Amino acid sequence: MENNRIVDFSKTSLHDIYGENCFNDAIMRELLPKAVYKELKEVQQGNKELTLETANAVASAMKTWAVSKGATHFTHWFQPLNDLTAEKHDSFIAPTEDGKVILEFSGKELIKGESDASSFPSGGLRATFEARGYTAWDTTSPAFLMADNTGVTLNIPTAFWSSSVQSPNTYHRCLNTFRHSGER
């Protein structure tokens, strides 16, 4: 994945590159074992709970795909009520005792992010000491890669949940609106 790549559309078709940095359905179908792909589709449709085994398989495939495109970090990406995006970056890279590195990314890391949300922007909705919360992976939104001058990051769409059961993000409120509109 190149940063700020300029595409010459006289030589490249938009159809060939559209979605190439998105961990979309076609990529999942290609990289996930058939049973895992099928179970994830059931989870996305609301027919099944996500198991840690499935999350681990998805995380492994997602990491392999992202690293093959130059990613070294991942972030749980969400939209707080300040109309910006918020994210907490973590690395796939873990040092070993012998001074080398290994690449790690587990289903637990995919499913749920930081439990201390004091580093997340609040838009003035709460004091820092009240910042208990976490991000939860939205299985229905595809992860995607973002590149800038510091490198490539895997962005995992999530919803933020505060421990006080308030939802300080627009995304969760939109999901609630859609869910409740179907109940009328």
Residue map of PLM features:
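Histidine/acidic residue-rich metal-binding segments in metalloenzymes
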Residues: E2-G107, I111-R132, T139
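Flexible C-terminal active-site loop/helix
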Residues: E109-R173, T177-H180, R184
